[in-house]
């Protein structure tokens, strides 16, 4: 059965956020919590976060919860979330459905006008990440995307994948 509805979000906003965050999720199944996207929901925002230990992607989006006192978090496999975003995209609203925390079902559901998807959540805890994000920044850079990506690709050919890319402005 479908879990209880938690709220709604525009399908295109959801799909964009998932695509921006899921790329940072790990691919190593020996670390299952890192193959997932952490989803936090409160009365105003949904926060999506993913990491593979070397990079972190976080996106906050506004939504319309059914319960203004909602505080919930879940961990969903990134591949599942990407598939849900793809198949439910196309306009309209997506309804999020969550199993009650007291239940052992651990299900998340997504409902659009035409489709319904249900998935089990991942076990485990997503690592704390908020302390890694600066509360304010002192600099801002505006760069052209295509030349920047070309430079990164050239550097990637001659560097070790585990060495972070350092940018100096």
Tell me the role of every PLM-derived stretch.
Residues 1-169:
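Structural preference for solvent-exposed beta-strand-turn elements
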């Amino acid at each position: 059965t479908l879990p209880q509805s938690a709220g709604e979000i525009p399908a295109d906003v959801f799909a964009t956020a998932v695509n921006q965050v899921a790329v940072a999720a790990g691919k190593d199944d020996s670390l299952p919590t890192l193959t997932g996207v952490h989803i936090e929901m409160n009365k105003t925002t949904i926060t999506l976060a993913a990491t593979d230990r070397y990079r972190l992607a976080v996106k906050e989006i506004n939504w319309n919860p059914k319960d203004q006192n909602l505080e919930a978090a879940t961990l969903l496999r990134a591949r599942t979330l990407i598939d849900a975003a793809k198949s439910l995209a196309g306009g309209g609203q997506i309804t999020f459905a969550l199993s009650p925390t007291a239940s052992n079902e651990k299900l998340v559901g997504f409902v659009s006008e035409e489709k319904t998807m249900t998935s089990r959540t991942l076990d485990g805890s997503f690592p704390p990440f908020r302390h890694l994000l600066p509360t304010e920044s002192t600099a801002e850079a505006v760069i052209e995307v295509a030349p920047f990506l070309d430079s990164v690709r050239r550097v990637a050919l001659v560097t070790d994948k585990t060495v972070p890319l350092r940018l100096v402005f």
